[in-house]
Swiss-Prot record:
The active site is at 135 (schiff-base intermediate with substrate). The keyword Transferase applies. It comes from Prochlorococcus marinus (strain NATL1A). Its EC number is 2.2.1.2. Its main location: cytoplasm. CDD domains: Transaldolase_TalAB. It holds the Pfam family TAL_FSA. GO terms for cellular component: cytoplasm. Belongs to the transaldolase family. Type 1 subfamily. This is Transaldolase.
Length: 332
């Protein structure tokens, strides 16, 4: 019998959730996703120090010798994310997701500006917009930024998505893809209820993605659904048939080593009609979020976590720049 990974690949686009190029080479995904935490983890690996140096050198050359180190580091942060993205694109046939600075999550204009800057860096190296997804947190401000960007043919992946109403707002904005989180929802419910586990069919994260998928398909939305943030392979197999699933190398390995039958669970051609199409404005969106303690807490936690990862990455870049150029290290 074929592995679960091979069977899953026949019904769902498998995406690698990592910045580790060696893991991507091993599992041959179609697409790949990165985020600040994954880039930070990869940047700790000796194998990727040359990419850090490349980002710093390019940024210094771009800004000039008179530019302050703090400005070079900030430029290098964007450059490093794109450098990793370009290396990933050499290994996959599809798209890479590169994330906008999470510290801009509540600033629509700044998010738009940063996204344009990121895509321009890819374009300058001959990479078309169709091969890049700009990851943006699913705040109201982020969703509105994505709505503008999509009209400019800059494709967006709305991340840190924890409830149905975030998904609806994204679909109404016409975004290319959403990343509803599974494992982080499970984490919250386990902590809130004191339960050690949930059967996969009752897993709150699985239930959430299933509802979103069926709503999108039954109402004709083109926005792709990519389940994310998995804690075990049972969550993944329960979502077999979802448009895409982005999976960590550890769970990709488990799927590759497990041989059992995998039935399709989600079918875009035969969605369950769960409710009629609804419409959200900013007021109704914020009311729905305010009434969902889990989604509000996890969105805030996610933005905070990614922001801290960016701070750490900037500090690492600063230290590396000091080694390259000499002088006293600057605390950012």
């Amino acid at each position: 019998m074929e592995s679960l990974l091979n069977q899953l690949s026949s019904m769902t686009v498998v995406v690698a959730d990592t910045g580790d190029l060696e893991a991507i080479k091993k599992y041959h995904p179609r697409d790949a996703t990165t985020n600040p935490s994954l880039i930070l983890a990869a940047a700790q690996m000796p194998a990727y120090q040359s990419l850090i140096d490349q980002a710093l050198t390019t940024s210094r050359e771009m800004l000039g010798t008179s530019a302050a180190k703090v400005d070079v580091v900030k430029e290098a942060l964007d450059e490093l994310c794109v450098v990793f993205g370009k290396e990933i694109l050499k290994l996959i046939p599809g798209r890479v997701s590169t994330e906008v600075d999470a510290r801009l999550s509540f600033d629509t204009d700044a998010t738009i500006e940063k996204a344009r800057k990121i895509i321009a860096k890819y374009n300058a190296d001959g990479i078309s917009n169709d091969r890049v997804l700009i990851k943006i947190a699913s705040t109201w401000e982020g969703i509105k930024a994505a709505e503008v960007l999509e009209k400019e043919n800059i494709h967006c992946n709305l991340t840190l998505l924890f409830n149905f109403y975030q998904a609806v707002a994204c679909a109404e904005a016409g975004v290319t893809l959403i990343s509803p989180f599974v494992g982080r929802i499970l984490d919250w419910y386990k902590s809130a209820t004191g339960r050690d586990s949930y059967p996969a069919t009752e897993d709150p994260g699985v239930v959430s993605v299933t509802k979103i998928f069926n709503y999108f398909k039954s109402n004709g939305y083109k926005t792709e659904v990519m389940g994310a943030s998995f804690r075990n392979i049972e969550e993944i197999t329960e979502l077999a048939g979802c448009d895409l699933l982005t999976i960590s190398p550890k769970l990709l390995q488990q799927l590759n080593e497990t041989h059992t039958d995998l039935p399709i669970k989600l079918n875009a051609q035969k969605p369950l009609v769960i409710e009629e199409k609804i419409h959200l404005d900013q007021t109704s969106f914020e009311l729905m979020m305010a009434g969902d303690k889990m989604a509000t807490e996890k969105l805030d936690d996610g933005i905070s976590g990614f922001s801290k990862a960016i701070d750490k990455l900037e500090n690492q870049l600063n230290e590396r720049l000091e080694l390259i150029e000499g002088g006293v290290a600057l605390t950012l």
